[in-house]
């Protein structure tokens, strides 16, 4: 089965040697996204809610480039700098995934790239 590299200017360019996403068959594997504004290339300043929104918007843009949407997401992994931000992150998360409710794990990590508060990766399935 062939794999296809997914890239869009509507999401941040990767900050390392990886793709924004890879599509294999009906699956789309979105790389970890941090709250970088794709227009400025800068980290979104602000609290966990603002950073969560930017991360999900980045994932959404990548999925759209692959012909999918947030409704097609089946699994999300959330990395938080501080698990005390869990409830606030969930407030924003539920605005985007309230209906589809993909499987998910959320973990606290000691540090994230560029010292952001959150990173998310997603797997989608699109027929």
Swiss-Prot record:
It comes from the Archaea. GO terms for molecular function: deaminase activity. Belongs to the RutC family. This is RutC family protein PYRAB12510. PROSITE patterns: UPF0076. GO terms for cellular component: cytosol. Pfam families: Ribonuc_L-PSP.
């Amino acid at each position: 089965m062939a794999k296809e590299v997914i890239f869009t200017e509507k999401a941040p360019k990767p900050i390392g040697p990886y793709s924004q996403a890879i599509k294999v068959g009906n699956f789309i594997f979105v790389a970890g996204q941090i709250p970088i504004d794709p227009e400025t290339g800068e980290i979104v300043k602000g609290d966990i809610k603002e950073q969560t929104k930017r991360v999900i918007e980045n994932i959404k843009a990548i999925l759209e480039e692959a012909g999918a949407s947030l409704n097609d997401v089946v699994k999300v992994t959330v990395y938080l700098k501080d698990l005390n931000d869990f409830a606030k992150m969930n407030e924003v998360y539920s605005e985007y995934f309230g209906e589809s409710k993909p499987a998910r794990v959320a973990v606290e990590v000691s540090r994230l790239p560029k010292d952001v508060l959150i990173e998310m990766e997603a797997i989608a399935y699109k027929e």
